[in-house]
Structure formats: structure tokens, C-alpha cells
């Protein structure tokens, strides 16, 4: 065999190996995105982070998912807003997201549940949200207790029905 044919064969084998590795990596990425979509769905992320999701029985186009909302959640902690995860995660590395997901948050964010996800689960959520791409605008900033709120908001304060309390 001539040197030219040997070099050509070696280059062809190297290219095929590279393409096979890319295909395997692509399958792994697709699996992570699918797993992340599943986790986002069953964990209820859309309930707060997708505008109109609860009110419409989950019938919101996926292109609108996880953009946050300008409707606040007010309680003794002040007023918080469900962030636009597509913008937040879009600015983070995977490692930054995993660390971010483990931190305590203000109510009503169930951070204690998110923090219990495995690293692989959090990486899958990251892959899914990144696959959606950046979209929307940043949500309003936190308002401390007693501060002026310029958006609609839900009040998270228990109300005691006095007719029931008297019984």
C-alpha cells in the first residue's frame, strides 16, 4: 500500500471516529434535554415561572415556558417574583447553575426541593432550559416588606374565617 493511501485511510478512520463520538455526545445531550423537560414538568417549575400556566391548565406553548412573570407573591418576606429562568440560566455555566440551585431562596420558591435534586438532575434541567434559548425580559426585583409594589401580586397570608374559628 502506498503512503498516500495509508494516510488517506488513517484520516478517514479518524473522521469517522470523530463523527461517531459526536453522534454519541448528541444522543447524550438529547437525553439530558428530554430528562430536563420531564423534571421541569413534574417539579412544577412552570406553575410559577411560566406566565398563565396554572390559569390555563398547563396549556401554554412550550416556546413561552420559563420566562418568569411580573405577577408577584407577597407575604411576610416581602414581594418576590418568579424569575425568567431562560435568561438567568442563559448567563450561567452548568457548574454555576448547580451551585445556584442549592442556595436558599425566598418564598414561595420551594428551594428545599430543588436543592435535593441530584447533580445529574440539575444538569438535565440546565440542558433543557438552555435548549429553549433566551427569551423574554427580566422579572421585577424583590420588594422588601412594606415597600411599594407596582405590579399585580398574590397575597400569601392565611385568613382565618371568624365564623369557623368561633365554633
Annotate each predicted stretch with a short phrase.
Residues 34-38, 46, 83, 95, ...:
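Solvent-exposed, polar/charged alpha-helical surfaces in well-ordered, non-transmembrane soluble domains
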Residues 1-7:
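N-terminal secretory signal peptides that target proteins for export/translocation
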Amino acid at each position: 500500500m502506498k503512503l498516500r493511501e495509508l494516510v488517506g485511510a488513517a484520516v478517514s478512520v479518524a473522521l469517522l471516529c470523530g463523527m461517531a463520538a459526536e453522534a454519541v455526545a448528541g444522543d447524550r445531550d438529547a437525553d439530558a434535554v428530554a430528562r430536563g423537560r420531564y423534571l421541569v414538568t413534574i417539579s412544577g417549575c412552570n406553575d410559577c415561572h411560566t406566565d398563565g400556566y396554572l390559569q390555563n391548565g398547563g396549556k401554554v406553548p412550550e416556546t413561552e415556558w420559563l420566562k418568569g412573570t411580573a405577577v408577584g407573591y407577597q407575604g411576610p418576606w416581602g414581594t418576590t417574583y418568579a424569575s425568567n429562568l431562560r435568561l438567568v440560566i442563559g448567563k450561567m455555566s452548568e457548574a454555576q447553575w448547580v451551585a445556584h440551585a442549592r442556595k436558599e431562596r425566598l418564598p414561595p420558591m420551594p428551594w428545599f426541593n430543588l436543592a435535593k435534586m441530584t447533580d445529574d438532575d440539575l444538569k438535565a434541567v440546565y440542558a433543557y432550559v438552555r435548549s429553549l434559548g433566551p427569551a423574554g425580559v427580566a422579572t421585577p426585583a424583590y420588594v422588601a416588606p412594606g415597600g411599594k409594589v407596582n405590579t399585580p401580586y398574590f397575597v400569601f397570608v392565611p385568613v382565618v374565617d371568624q365564623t369557623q374559628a368561633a365554633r
